[in-house]
Curated annotation (Swiss-Prot):
It comes from Spinacia oleracea. The lineage of its organism: Eukaryota, Viridiplantae, Streptophyta, Embryophyta, Tracheophyta. SUPFAM superfamilies: Helical scaffold and wing domains of SecA (SSF81886), P-loop containing nucleoside triphosphate hydrolases (SSF52540), Pre-protein crosslinking domain of SecA (SSF81767). Its main location: plastid. It is found in: Plastid, Chloroplast stroma; Plastid, Chloroplast thylakoid membrane. This is Protein translocase subunit SecA, chloroplastic.
């Protein structure tokens, strides 16, 4: 291998020569043959008076590739030696963690395996009956640990009969890790979805319910339909909660033994339950055991964004449009600056002057105008929130795209006027601004579960965070087969243009060899741009991103991503929860074939799924591309499917089912166990025959793909965590299959541009050729350091959010407990008496003071305030109090008694007029005051959190300041709730409402009108005097 040092001018000309050579190869569509990814090997070194390049591109292309191949072999050998040395050192320190886990659970696995012959001999009904026996043992007090071996053996046998899958020993270990309340790290393809049913079944035996949480509706439905079959076969009820379900359906599904649900739906249902105004509106049961699939995605990636339920707040939309026009006219670094790392903008002096002149105001921060917030949000919308990256436009709606999953977050909106600013930028109708009604972070929400566990393919790198925040230990579960995927070195370019050209070359080469290729992009925009380049290169491919037309075909696209020569471009949607089977997924293809023929004939017109509340859904055909199926269905099986569908239509009715009902029945039909229902049995038989026919073709295709080298994964940008990069790589090499991966990077990528610092900037200045691949140890260290910076930065954000939310969490718990007490209690008398006595104490303390001697008591002032709160205390006089009370304690006891008796007197008055009405009024008063004041408290504490940051300049800890001020605000809020509720109760007067029918006839009601129930759902007919916070003085 030859190296040569060149001067700056020589290097420039040489680089240009190399650049043209490289471009020529790009135009040719590939570099050489073979199935392995091309080895880019231009190395940058430093020394002497400048920088030198060691050029390995000498001689003919074939000779260059041979040299590079030798270099890669030497490097692999060196890396293997270092790896072996590392393993020796690691084993010396304590051994392989996966092997340690295997040894820890070996005895229990042996016990389960010993039970297998006995359990296998049972009939289907006998196997189902085992659930009742195990449940009796659990309810009688026997520990779940002692029941575990038999329960796992039962689930294994049921899985074998229903799914045709026998859980491996390592899957049993994964189930035991989950049952223990830990995080199980399992590689992709090791069957995490099937593992979840083991501890879910065991813990469901207690009758307290189990939640299996996934990251999106698609995975929740898929898992419920697939592994849920096992639990249903064993006699358990399995529920599914989806985004567009009604409260009644949600409640029914949450009451099942095992419920599949997304993290956001579960969190929002919790918040909605704590805004309910009647017990009938509650949907959740008590929390017991929770299994989180892709636990790192939910507890780490999404932990930065709290769950928020908002209500409308009136704001003039014209200001958003004006602000958007101003932001569009402003120039960066002249009128404002942008901090992409902190996601903040700052208006400069020139920006202030121009904005104030355009708006004809003296001060942007004038509290009467508050233009500054509108301008800042408009600039954020312009610079930091980009179309087809952070959001997409569907119709006249702005829909947020989740940065971690790549999916549309239906129904979500940015808060604090930001969503309105984006709407103004894009020129779509602006919806009213919102105000927070309830919020909680994922950290504090999931910590409410008495028993929490999770599973993922990548958790070890975040084990410290899991243990420090969630008290969850990470356990590495061994693989069933060795992982043989080849992870190639990163290829780095100076500019993004060179990177994308190289990606196209890589895809072209792989496609020619027959390798299936999965390309991961970080945004909708990137996926669409790459798709256009592949179309120009005449490379057939599929695109999976947040666009609605692609989302609907998600399962279809994933099912064929592992087929020979398939090219799939995907955002992070394909990074998690998707199992790409080499050769194609025969069973899923069979299900799609039956679905294609069944759904149009049984689903009601117009019930084609949830699209938008603002426009009718498009007509849905369920038609699947013919190229998806590996072969044309034989006449025998086509007839079998047609007969089964005809029987289903005849039995269920022509177009009589909702889509959800039809999907559920289809999922039952596509199982493997025996069926009692004639229609389900007929459909199931057709499904199994079609799957069998398809499998002969997919198995043959799988062999070809394996020989070619397996699935090749291409990453186009480093993510904010190595963990997310590994998720993408993990789509390849499942269950011992071959595969490869390579990342193509650019120094202009967001992560390096924003977090790279001076070292990356220096590298960008040193390398001026866009198409020249760069490789060096210094560069690798710089890129790794930038990624570590991002990881540490976002960890600090999550930790800070958790610390601040912990302050609010204790307050939230107290408020929600008080609210639930008012909602569910049949008798609120004791609570109202407590409120009355404490309010008397507050008034007494504010107007007399515990240290004041009797001769200084201002009894007239005290009595005036008391009578403002309660007209029933009009008999109080200074003489009466003076004669009956000699000390402050006597006065306190006397006023408490007066407050208590006044409440009881008021209650009797109302009950005499309308029995049962006082209880409803009390509940209404408590709930409405809690909700209103809690909403105001959330706003106030948000302002405190924003303000305390500045106190760091005064050498004061912002978190401690936040805790102190937050605590004082909370105490005042709780006192205000008590005062408002008891004041309203004292002033409450029922209103006689005549029967509506009699009012129309003009006849009096002959029955006792006052005994009629007044508006259960809404107490609007009841006249409730305003609380002290409005018409009456609230200063006690």
């Amino acid at each position: 291998m030859e190296s040569c040092a060149r001067s700056a001018s020589q290097m420039s000309s040489s680089s240009c020569c190399r650049c043209s050579s490289f471009n020529q190869k790009l135009k040719q569509g590939g570099i050489g043959g073979g199935s392995l990814p091309v080895s880019f090997s231009c190395v940058m070194i430093g020394g002497g008076g400048g920088r030198r390049l060691i050029d390995q591109e000498r001689g003919k292309v074939r000779g260059r590739e041979r040299k590079i191949g030798e270099l890669m072999q030497v490097r692999a050998s060196a890396q293997g030696g270092l790896l072996n040395l590392g393993n020796l050192l690691f084993n010396f320190k304590g051994g392989d963690p996966a092997e340690s886990t295997k040894q820890q659970y070996a005895s229990t696995v042996t016990l389960i395996n010993q039970l297998e012959p006995q359990i296998s001999s049972l009939t289907d009904s006998q196997l189902t009956d085992r659930t009742s026996l195990l449940r009796q043992r659990a309810l009688s007090g026997e520990s779940l640990d002692s029941i575990l071996p038999e329960a796992f053996a039962v689930v294994r046998e049921a899985s074998k009969r229903v799914l045709g899958l026998r859980p491996f020993d390592v899957q049993l270990i994964g189930g035991m890790v989950l049952h223990k309340g830990e995080i199980a790290e399992m590689r992709t393809g090791e069957g995490k979805t099937l593992v979840a049913i083991l501890p879910a079944y065991l813990n469901a035996l207690t009758g307290k319910g189990v939640h299996v949480v996934t990251v999106n509706d698609y995975l929740a439905r898929r898992d419920c339909e697939w592994v849920g079959q096992v639990a249903r076969f064993l006699g358990l009820k399995v529920g599914l909660v989806q985004q567009n379900m009604t409260s009644e359906v949600r409640r029914e599904n949450y009451l099942c033994d095992i419920t599949y649900v997304t993290n956001s739906e579960l969190g929002f249902d919790f918040l909605r339950d704590n805004l309910a105004t009647s017990v009938d509106e509650l949907v959740l049961r008590g929390f017991n055991f929770c299994v989180i699939d892709e636990v790192d995605s939910i507890l780490i990636d999404e932990a930065r964004t709290p769950l928020i339920i908002s209500g409308p707040a009136e704001k003039p939309s014209e200001r958003y449009y004006k602000a958007a026009k101003i932001a569009a006219a402003f120039e960066r670094d002249i009128h404002y600056t942008v901090d992409e790392k902190q996601k903040t903008v700052l208006i400069m002096e020139q920006g202030y002057q121009d904005a104030e002149e355009i708006l004809d105001v003296e001060d942007l921060y004038d509290p009467r105008e508050q233009w500054a917030l509108y301008i800042l949000n408009a600039i954020k919308a312009k610079e930091l929130f980009l179309k087809d990256v952070n959001y997409i436009i569907r119709g006249k709606e702005i829909l947020i795209v989740d940065e971690f999953t790549g999916r549309v977050m239906q129904g979500r909106r940015w808060s604090d006027g930001l969503h309105q600013a984006v709407e103004a930028k894009e020129g779509v109708p602006i919806q009213n601004e919102t105000i927070t009604l309830a919020s909680i972070s994922y950290q504090n929400f999931f910590l409410q579960f008495p028993k929490l566990c999770g599973m993922t393919g990548t958790a070890a790198t975040e084990s410290a965070e899991f243990e420090s925040i969630y008290k969850l230990k990470v356990t590495i579960v061994p693989t069933n087969k060795p992982m043989i995927r080849k992870d190639e070195s990163d290829v780095v370019f100076r500019a993004t243009s060179g990177k994308w050209r190289a990606v196209v070359v890589e895809i072209s080469r792989m496609h020619k060899t027959g390798l299936p290729v999965l390309v991961g992009t970080t945004s909708v925009e990137q996926s669409e741009s790459l798709s256009e380049q592949l179309q120009q290169a005449s490379i057939p491919h599929e695109v999976l991103n947040a666009k609605p037309e692609n989302v609907e075909r998600e399962a279809e696209i994933v099912a064929q991503s592992g087929r020979l020569g398939a090219v799939t471009i995907a955002t992070n949607m394909a990074g998690r929860g998707t199992d790409i089977i080499l050769g194609g997924n025969a069973e899923f293809m069979a299900r799609l074939k039956i679905r294609e023929m069944l759904m149009p004939r049984v689903v009601r017109p117009g019930d084609g799924g949830f699209v938008s509340m603002k426009k009718p859904p498009p007509m849905k055909t369920w038609k699947v591309k013919e190229t998806l199926f590996p072969c044309k269905l034989s006449q025998k099986n086509a007839k079998l499917v047609d007969e089964a569908v005809q029987l289903a239509v005849k039995t269920w009715g022509q177009r009589s089912l909702s889509e959800l009902e039809a999907e559920e029945r289809l999922s039952y039909s596509c199982e493997k166990g025996p069926a009692q229902d004639e229609v389900i049995a007929k459909l199931r038989h057709a499904f199994l025959e079609v799957a069998k026919e398809y499998k002969t073709f997919t198995d043959e295709e799988k062999n070809k793909v394996v020989l070619a080298g397996g699935l090749h994964v291409i990453g186009t940008e480093r993510h904010e965590s190595r963990r997310i990069d590994n998720q993408l790589r993990g789509r390849s090499g499942r269950q011992g299959d071959p595969g490869s991966s390579r990342f193509f990077l650019s120094l202009e990528d967001n992560i390096f541009r924003v977090f790279g610092g001076d070292r990356i900037q220096g590298l960008m200045r040193a390398f001026r050729v866009e198409d020249l691949p760069i490789e060096s140890k210094m560069l690798t260290r710089a890129l790794d350091e930038a990624q570590r910076k991002v990881e540490n930065y976002f960890f600090d954000i999550r930790k800070q959010l958790f610390e601040y939310d912990e302050v609010l969490n204790s307050q939230r718990d107290r408020v929600y407990v008080e609210r639930r007490r008012a909602l569910e209690s049949d008798n609120l008398e004791s609570l109202l008496i407590e409120y009355a006595e404490l309010t008397m104490d507050d008034i007494l303390e504010a107007n007399i003071g515990s240290d004041a001697p009797k001769e200084n008591w201002d009894l007239e002032k005290l009595i005036a305030k008391l009578q403002q709160y309660c007209y029933l205390l009009n008999d109080l006089t200074p003489e009466l109090l003076s004669n009956n009370c000699s000390t402050y304690e006597d006065l306190q006891d006397y006023l408490r008694r007066c407050g208590r008796e006044a409440y009881l007197q008021k209650k009797d008055m109302v009950e005499n007029q309308a029995p049962g009405l006082m209880k409803e009024a009390e509940r209404f008063l408590i709930l409405s005051n809690i909700d209103r004041l809690w909403k105001e408290h959330l706003q106030a504490i948000k302002f405190v959190q924003q303000a305390v940051g500045l106190r760091g300049y005064a050498q004061r800890d912002p978190l401690i300041e936040y805790k102190l001020e937050g605590y004082n605000l909370f105490l005042e809020m709780m006192a205000q709730i008590r005062r408002n509720v008891i004041y309203s109760a004292y002033q409450f007067k029922p209103v006689v409402v005549k029967n509506q029918e009699q009012q129309q006839k003009g006849k009096p009601d002959s029955s006792n009108v006052e005994n009629k129930r007044i508006g259960d759902a809404n107490l609007n007919p009841v006249s409730v005097t305003e609380s002290p916070s409005s018409d009456s003085p609230q200063n006690t």
